Amino acid sequence: MGRDEEAAAQAEAWNHGFGFIKTSVIKTAIELEIPDILHNQGGPLSLSALSSAVGVPPDRLHRIMRFLAHHGVSKKTASPPGESDYYYAETAVSRSLTKDNLGPFVLLQGAQRGPSACITAQGLKSRERPGVEELGSDPLYEDPIFTEKVFRDAMTCHARVTTSAVIENYGEGFRGVGSLVDVGGSYGMTLGMLVEAFPWIRGICYDLPPVVAKAKPLHGVEFVAGSMFESVPKADVIMLMFVLHNWSDNECIDILKRCKEAIPAETGRLMIIDAIIDEDGEGDEFAGARLGLDVTMMAVTYEGKERTHREWAYILTEAGFRKYVVNNIKALESLIEAYP
């Protein structure tokens, strides 16, 4: 190894060593609402004005903003003539970190009890969920504050961003759909967005009784309680979004069989919205995030995972689906159409 290669390798190692600092700084910026402030400003904002808005001393905030700018989370701009203050503006990345975008999801990953804290050597040796074993409890469900605020906000923003991508990049796929069941649809936000975009659809949100009991009425959406392991309401199209990555292959096959039973044999369709891991580990700009999500699922579920094309083909074939098509929706997830 030449000196240049060795220096590059050491630089990469240093960057990995400070990886948690990057997560912590971005998490802190979101908590201070810096991405939202820059977005609402509509143009460059001075360091002194930003300091007043977030309540952080200028000397400290300057160092945070310098770090964020280096990583593309803000942009340092030229100061107006006669001014010596620093000025910063939003970037495409900072817009993606606002509270109406992926900000809440990033907060979950950076939380003290979040998934990123769950990956340890000792935890990986466990036969159970590595993260739950390491923390001694299930952080996603046993802490009411964590569950009701951090976790739920993260899941909501993730669903909103992905549903918007589905509407924008797969809109034609909803033409002619009379009825659609969202299996594991929670409180119906995704289905509500779809029905609003495609008002001819009769939406059915299907989830466990305790979830349905808390759901508020939504125009065009009917709530039905039940278990996807037992049966699924009949419809033209069944949708599974962020569901199958929680379960083992055998459990997924059972769920898929129930979905197949609920759609017409000749015209029915199953829509799966989940990540697909590229076989060779490369892929598009979302490849690294998909691998990170896969490790997260290993930490917080018993046998959940993100699947490769081959693994998706296996569970779909075993469940009796004759063919499937993968649609790129320009998101972390893909949309898989499966036909009985």
Swiss-Prot record:
InterPro entries: COMT-like, O_MeTrfase_dom, Plant_O-MeTrfase_dimerisation, SAM-dependent_MTases_sf, WH-like_DNA-bd_sf, WH_DNA-bd_sf. Keywords: Methyltransferase, S-adenosyl-L-methionine, Transferase. One of its GO terms (biological process) is methylation. Homodimer. Flavonoid 7-O-methyltransferase involved in the biosynthesis of polymethoxylated flavonoids natural products such as nevadensin and salvigenin, aroma compounds which contribute to the flavor of sweet basil, and exhibit pharmacological activities such as anti-allergic, anti-oxidant, antibacterial, anti-proliferative, and anti-inflammatory effects. PANTHER family: O-METHYLTRANSFERASE. This is Flavonoid 7-O-methyltransferase 1. The lineage of its organism: Eukaryota, Viridiplantae, Streptophyta, Embryophyta, Tracheophyta. The gene is FOMT1.
